[in-house]
Amino acid sequence: MSIGILGKKLGMSQFFDDQGRAIPVTLIEAGPCRITQLKTSEIDGYAAVQIGFGDTREKLINKPSKGHLTKSGEVLLKHLREYRVEGLEGLELGAAITVGSFEAGQKVDVSGDTMGRGFAGYQKRHGFSRGPMSHGSKNHREPGSTGAGTTPGRIYPGKRMAGRYGGKKRTTRGLTILKVDSNRNLLVVKGSVPGKPGALLNIRPAKRVGNKPAQGGK
């Protein structure tokens, strides 16, 4: 069952292995999530599972969403995500999805929004080298040439320039789960994941392990 789970990034810490080596890890509070909808090939054209996560206030949920969530017995859910599956065996509307569906040593893909840094210049956004800082130079943090004059007479699309930095959806693939704490709904994942502490994360079984597709992956 290749269903993922939604969670919240708590921050980073250290995990010590059996040999005493310090490993940087990310702590993720994952679930419990509620199955809010089951889609079938006969009705929807494909099989999928929709889950909900996160508490919210009732006045922030509109009537269509409230009617949709009432079917699963849970109304106050803030985030919804859908996962395509091959079959719906063993899945029930309103059932809980917890970190118990993962295990230590498993590879996962973690998606989230990167930290937004606002409007940033060339050096911070793209890592450009700065100009000479000596007296007489007029190019300290300028980008330099952005293109020729008459030909082509324009700036090519995709030219790296100053602009909004961060706040993009990114996926870190092939991360290893080092520990699963079912009592605290906690996943300890090796390495870093996108987003700042408190950011919403989508954790799902890895599609690829090494250079080969994972079992059940597409």
Swiss-Prot record:
GO terms (BP aspect): translation
Oligomeric form and interacting partners: Part of the 50S ribosomal subunit. Forms a cluster with proteins L14 and L19.
Cross-referenced NCBIfam families: L3_bact
HAMAP family: Ribosomal_uL3_B
Job description of the protein: One of the primary rRNA binding proteins, it binds directly near the 3'-end of the 23S rRNA, where it nucleates assembly of the 50S subunit.
Stretch list, region Disordered: 126-170
Gene of this entry: rplC
MF (Gene Ontology): rRNA binding; structural constituent of ribosome
A Pfam short name: Ribosomal_L3
Top-rank taxon: Bacteria
Gene Ontology terms: cellular component: cytosolic large ribosomal subunit
The protein's name in its UniProt record: Large ribosomal subunit protein uL3
InterPro entries membership: Ribosomal_uL3, Ribosomal_uL3_bac/org-type, Ribosomal_uL3_CS, Transl_B-barrel_sf
Family from the record: Belongs to the universal ribosomal protein uL3 family.
Organism of derivation: Prochlorococcus marinus (strain MIT 9313)
Keywords, sorted A to Z: Ribonucleoprotein, Ribosomal protein, RNA-binding, rRNA-binding
